[in-house]
Structure formats: C-alpha cells, structure tokens
C-alpha cells in the first residue's frame, strides 16, 4: 500500500513497525537529467494544440492564473498527440513477456508476435534465463529508506549462482534519454537487502552490484537489444 505521497508503506525489517519508504523511481527521477524527456513532453503539447483548434481557442481565453483550466488543456493536448498511447501499448507488451517468462500457455496476438519472438531470441542469443519467481518483486534498502519493484532477475548461462538485475523497457527512446535514471534505479535494486513477499521479508539473493541489464524491446518494431549497464556509481 501507499501513502498520500505515493510512498510505499511497509514494515521496517528491524522493528516490524510500518513506515513510509521513498520510491526508487522518485530517487532516480530526482538525480537524473530529465531534460530530454521534458522536451519531448513539451513537443507533444504543441502538437496536440496544433491538432485541436478548440484547445487553442480555450488557451487563448485563459488568464495565467487559470491554472486548473490550463492543466486540463495540457492533458487534452497530450491525449490529442497520443503522448500516452505508446506507454499503454508498452504496458501490455510488458505483461505479455511476463506471462511468457512464467511459461504460461498463451495465445499471443499477431500484433505482438514479432516483438515477443524478438524478446525470446535475444534471451537465447545472450544465454539469459529469467527466474519466474523473481519478477515484479518489492525490495527495500533500509540504510536509505528506499523501496522499489524490481522487474526481473536473470541468470547467465544456467540457473543458480549470481543473478543479474534486468529491466525490460518498451519505450522508443529509452536508451537515448533515460539511461541515467534507469542506472540509478537498477543500482538501488541491486543493493537492496530485503525482499517483501506480502507477508514477511526474505533475504535478497546474491546479485551483481556492478552491472545490470536493460532489455530494450520497443513496441511494434520486432527487435530487442540487451544493454549492459555499469551501476557501480549508484
């Protein structure tokens, strides 16, 4: 569960008392240079207003203090530019890969087949094995009061021994704009000490703390690239 600020509410591993934990994404967003992402968002607002004359007319009618109305115009402009459609498709593809990794009997729609095939082939080509028991797990780093949800753990060559943190990304420009933020997140996950299973804490399995993987599977492109990320600085 979360508090009103979006922080995880979880027991402290030492005291057992519930407390808020800062999200790993919040820490990463604060430390990372988000200029590229912010510029992308601004461009989408411009494109959305250009596509919707009614939004332009509404904007002209507003005064600077009409903040609520202006915020609604921005949201509508982003929708008009389909700024979030890629994210929705990416979420769907992400969930499909999770089901594939769990070995579920899944009838994959034709629209996703090339992407899923590319993902599976990339794992084979790089000798990677996803541990289905270690996907979407909440981990905590008590020293800094941080919690987050790691995407998946993988093994290189064969299951067992040291695992490596992996994060599947489906955005088009994630490697171009978001790698600093992602590296910070992955460093947090790799240095976490406890795993919350919904009832109690488990110990974090042994993972590499100097490297992690970004699995880039851009929606609709039928290709998948795996990038090794240096997370030692995190």
Where are these predicted regions, by residue range?
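Metal-dependent nuclease catalytic cores that hydrolyze phosphodiester bonds in DNA/RNA
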Residues: 1-147
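Mg2+/Mn2+-dependent nuclease catalytic core
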Residues: 133-234
């Amino acid at each position: 569960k979360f508090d009103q600020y979006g922080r995880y509410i979880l027991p402290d591993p030492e005291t057992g008392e519930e407390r808020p934990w800062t999200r790993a994404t919040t820490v990463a967003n604060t430390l990372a240079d988000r200029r590229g992402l912010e510029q992308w968002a601004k461009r989408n607002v411009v494109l959305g207003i250009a596509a919707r004359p009614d939004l332009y007319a509404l904007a002209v009618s507003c005064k600077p203090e009409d903040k609520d109305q202006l915020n609604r115009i921005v949201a509508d402009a982003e929708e008009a530019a389909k700024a979030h459609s890629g994210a929705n498709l990416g979420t769907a593809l992400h969930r499909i890969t999770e089901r594939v990794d769990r070995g579920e009997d899944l009838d994959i729609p034709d629209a996703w087949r090339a992407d899923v095939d590319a993902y599976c082939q990339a794992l084979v080509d790089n000798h990677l094995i996803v541990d289905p028991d270690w996907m979407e797990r909440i981990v905590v780093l008590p020293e800094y009061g941080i919690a987050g949800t790691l995407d998946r753990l993988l093994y290189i060559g064969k299951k067992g021994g040291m695992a490596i943190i992996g994060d599947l990304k489906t955005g088009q420009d994630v490697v171009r704009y978001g790698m600093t933020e992602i590296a910070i997140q992955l460093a947090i996950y790799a240095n976490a000490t406890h795993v919350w299973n919904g009832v109690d804490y488990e110990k974090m399995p042994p993972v590499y703390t100097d490297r992690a993987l970004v699995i880039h599977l851009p929606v609709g492109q039928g290709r998948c690239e795996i990038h090794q990320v240096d997370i030692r600085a995190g």
